[in-house]
């Protein structure tokens, strides 16, 4: 549980099995903590589109996000376009969303908000 520290400061933990799949009440608590992210696929994933001025900045964000994904051992699905990236998180090992998805979503948002790729 990450209630005592901000999501972007938390780290992913190994999560396997349906015991770690988040229920509706926990999703309702976590979703407001990651503004701009939306539930997708009937609550099985979260997504957000990040927009950039050009392809260079788009790929810079993708590369920085790949570093975060490697460090956290939790990897998003990405749709990479000239001026945007669609990021999708879901935890396959739990069959839906886990806390790890929200931790990484917060880290991705922080990366974008800090303008690391500008």
UniProtKB/Swiss-Prot annotation:
Q: Please name every pair of cysteines joined by a disulfide bond in this record.
A: none
Q: What is this protein called?
A: Putative pterin-4-alpha-carbinolamine dehydratase
Indicate the family of this protein. Belongs to the pterin-4-alpha-carbinolamine dehydratase family.
Identify the EC number(s): 4.2.1.96
Q: Does the keyword Lyase apply?
A: yes
Offer an example of a GO molecular function term for this protein: 4-alpha-hydroxytetrahydrobiopterin dehydratase activity
Q: Which reaction does it catalyse?
A: (4aS,6R)-4a-hydroxy-L-erythro-5,6,7,8-tetrahydrobiopterin = (6R)-L-erythro-6,7-dihydrobiopterin + H2O
Please verify whether the record's keywords include Lyase. yes
Q: What class of enzyme is it?
A: lyase
Q: What keywords sit in the KW lines?
A: Lyase
Q: Name one GO biological process term.
A: tetrahydrobiopterin biosynthetic process
